[in-house]
A protein has these predicted regions:
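Rossmann-like NAD(P) dinucleotide-binding subdomain of oxidoreductase/dehydrogenase enzymes
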Residues: 131-276, 325, 401, 466
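Residue-level signal for inorganic ion chemistry
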Residues: 39, 75, 97, 119, ...
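Structural signal for hydrophobic packing residues in well-ordered secondary-structure cores
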Residues: 64, 68, 83-90, 94, ...
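Short, well-ordered beta-strand elements within core beta-sheets of diverse protein domains
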Residues: 42-48, 63-69, 155, 264-267, ...
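Hydrophobic face of amphipathic alpha-helices that form TPR/SEL1-like repeat modules
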Residues: 2-37, 359
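ALDH superfamily catalytic-core signature
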Residues: 238-381, 404, 410, 444, ...
Length: 509
C-alpha cells in the first residue's frame, strides 16, 4: 500500500467503531480506498467479520435502553455541540472527502453543509417529536399519543455524498432516541469515520452510533439482524431494490432512495443565461455524480436555438484534482467512467450527436485518474441508452419537443421520478408543470431542487422504495412509532356490570 506523505486521517486501515472504541478489524478481506484523481490507494477498508457485526448490533441494542430514557432536551444539547464541532472541523472534513471521493473542495464543503443543516434541524426535536392530545373524547376520558424511538436502526450510505447522506440518517435517528449502526460506502469510509469521531466528542454515548464496514456481507447482515428495526438506504436501483425486498421480508421498515433521470425543461420565455448556466452547473458539477443532477435537458419549441450556445459554454469546463482550481473532479472508479463512455458511444451509433466530447480527456499531471470531460449529447431519442439509463457522469443529454405538454408526457413516461425543473418566466407554465409532472422534487428556475430539512427529500415511482421519506418531519416519523393512550379517570366509577358491546367513545356516560 502506498504511504502518504501528508496523511489527513490517522490510520491506514479503516477501523470499526463499536462501543465508543475505534478497533482494528480481524477481517481477511479488504477493499482499497482509492483517490480517484491519482489512482493511489489511500486506505484499506475491511469487510467486518460476522463476530464484529454481531458485537456492534448487540452493543447498539444495549446502549439504546438508557439513551431512549435520556430527556429529549439532553439529546438535543448533544446535537448542538455536534453542529459546532462540524463547523470547527469543516475544512478538514472537506479535505478528507475530496481525497477519497474526488469532488472539488468547494463542492465538498457544500456536501458537508447540506448535511449540517439536517443536524441543525434535529435541534428542534422537542417540537418535531410531539404527539397529540384530545381531552374529554368521552366523559372523563382523554386520548393522547406520543412518538417513541424504534430501537436500533441502520444506515447504508452511497459513495457520492460521503458527508451529507450519513448526516441525513444518524443525527435524526439518534436525536429521536434510537441507536444507529452505520455502514458507509466501502469506497469512501473516511469521511464517515471523521463524522463519527466528532459525534463521540460531542457527547453521543458509546454504542449509540456504531460503524461497521464492508460490501454485500455487511448489507445482508443489516437486512437480517433481528435487532435492527429500520434501514435507511441511498444508492443505486439494484442494491436498493434488494435491500428493500430483503429488509421488509424480515419485518423491517425500509426507506430507499434509488436512481434518477432528472429532466430540465427549457421554455422559450426562460432567462437564457440563467437556464443554460443552470443546466451546465447541475449536470457537470460533481462530475455528474448527483442523484439530483439535471442530466437531461428538454428544449421546448424555439428554445432549441440555444443548444449550440449551451454546448459552447459546457466545452469550457475542465476536470482536474479536487484540491486544485478545477471545475469538477474525476469519476469515482474506472468502471464508472467506462460505463458513462459506453452509454454515450452506443447512443452515438444510433444517431445521437456528441457536440461536446469528453470521452478522451486526460489530465497530464495525474494520468491514472478516472477522468472524463464535460459532454453534451444531442439529437437524442427516448429509446437511446444514454436516455434510458442514468449515466451518472458529466454528460448532458439533450432532447427537443414542440410543447410543454410533450415535455411533461416525456417525463411522466420515464420510470424515474426523483426530481425535475422548469425554466420559464410564465407563472401559468410553471403552475401547470408543478401540478402535472410526476416527480418528488420540482424546481422552478432552480437547477438542483433539493429541499431544506424543514421539508423532506421525496421521490416518485422507481426512484423510491418505502413510503416515508428522509429527514424533516417524515424522517422523524420513520425513526419513531406512535403509541396512543386512552385514559379514564372517572371520579366515581359506576358498577353497571360487564358489557359485551363495543364501547362508544364520545358518548357521555
Amino acid at each position: 500500500m502506498m504511504r502518504r506523505t501528508a496523511p489527513i486521517f490517522s490510520v491506514a486501515t479503516v477501523k470499526n467503531l463499536i462501543d465508543g472504541k475505534f478497533t482494528e478489524s480481524k477481517a481477511t478481506k479488504f477493499y482499497d480506498v482509492i483517490n480517484p484523481a491519482t489512482g493511489s490507494v489511500i486506505a484499506k477498508c475491511p469487510q467486518s467479520t460476522p463476530e464484529e457485526m454481531r458485537a456492534a448490533v448487540e452493543n447498539s441494542a444495549a446502549a439504546q435502553v438508557a439513551w431512549r430514557n435520556t430527556s429529549v432536551g439532553n439529546r438535543v444539547r448533544v446535537m448542538l455541540k455536534y453542529q459546532q464541532l462540524i463547523r470547527e472541523n469543516s475544512k478538514q472534513i472537506a479535505e478528507i472527502l475530496t481525497e477519497e471521493q474526488g469532488k472539488t473542495l468547494g463542492d465538498a464543503e457544500g456536501d458537508l453543509f447540506r448535511g449540517l443543516e439536517v443536524v441543525e434541524h434535529t435541534c428542534s426535536m422537542g417540537t418535531l417529536i410531539m404527539g397529540e392530545t384530545v381531552e374529554n373524547v368521552s366523559a372523563h376520558m382523554d386520548t393522547y399519543s406520543y412518538r417513541q424511538p424504534l430501537g436500533v436502526t441502520a444506515g447504508i450510505c452511497p459513495f457520492n455524498f460521503p458527508a451529507m447522506i450519513p448526516l441525513w440518517m444518524f443525527p435524526v435517528a439518534i436525536t429521536a432516541g434510537n441507536a444507529m449502526l452505520l455502514k458507509p460506502s466501502e469506497k469512501v469510509p473516511l469521511t464517515s469515520m471523521k463524522l463519527a469521531e466528532l459525534a463521540l466528542q460531542a457527547g453521543v454515548p458509546a454504542g449509540i452510533v456504531n460503524v461497521i464496514h464492508g460490501g454485500h456481507d455487511a448489507v445482508n447482515f443489516i437486512c437480517d439482524a433481528p435487532e435492527i428495526r429500520a434501514i435507511s438506504f441511498v444508492g443505486g436501483n439494484a442494491a436498493g431494490e434488494y435491500i428493500h425486498a430483503r429488509g421488509t421480508k424480515n419485518g423491517k421498515r425500509v426507506q430507499a432512495n434509488l436512481g434518477a433521470k432528472n429532466h430540465g425543461v427549457i421554455m422559450p420565455d426562460a432567462d437564457k443565461d440563467h437556464a443554460l448556466n443552470s443546466l451546465i452547473g447541475s449536470s457537470i458539477g460533481a462530475c455528474g455524480q448527483r442523484c439530483m443532477a439535471l442530466s437531461t435537458a428538454v428544449f421546448v419549441g424555439d428554445a432549441k436555438k440555444w443548444i449550440p450556445e449551451l454546448a459552447e459554454r459546457a466545452s469550457k469546463l475542465r476536470p482536474g484534482p479536487g484540491n486544485k482550481n478545477s471545475d469538477f473532479g474525476p469519476m469515482i472508479t474506472k468502471e464508472a467512467r467506462d460505463r458513462a463512455i459506453r452509454l454515450i458511444t452506443e447512443s452515438e451509433k444510433l444517431g445521437a450527436k456528441v457536440l461536446v466530447d469528453g470521452r478522451n480527456v486526460t489530465v497530464p499531471e495525474h494520468p491514472n485518474g478516472n477522468w472524463i470531460g464535460a459532454s453534451v449529447v444531442t439529437d437524442v431519442t427516448t429509446e437511446m441508452p444514454c436516455y434510458k439509463e442514468e449515466i451518472f457522469g458529466p454528460a448532458l443529454v439533450v432532447l427537443t419537443v414542440d410543447t410543454l405538454d410533450d415535455a411533461i408526457n416525456m417525463i411522466n413516461k420515464n420510470p424515474y421520478g426523483n426530481g425535475t425543473s422548469i425554466f420559464t418566466s410564465s407563472g401559468i407554465a410553471a403552475r401547470k408543470f408543478q401540478h402535472d409532472v410526476d416527480a418528488g422534487q420540482v424546481g422552478i428556475n432552480v437547477p438542483i431542487p433539493v429541499p431544506l430539512p424543514y421539508f423532506s427529500f421525496t421521490g416518485s415511482r422507481a426512484s423510491i422504495r418505502g413510503d416515508i421519506n428522509f429527514y424533516g418531519k417524515q424522517g422523524v416519523q420513520f425513526y419513531t412509532q406512535v403509541k396512543t393512550i386512552s385514559s379514564n379517570w372517572n371520579p366515581k366509577f359506576k358498577n353497571t356490570g360487564a358489557t359485551v358491546n363495543m364501547p362508544i367513545l364520545g358518548k357521555d356516560q
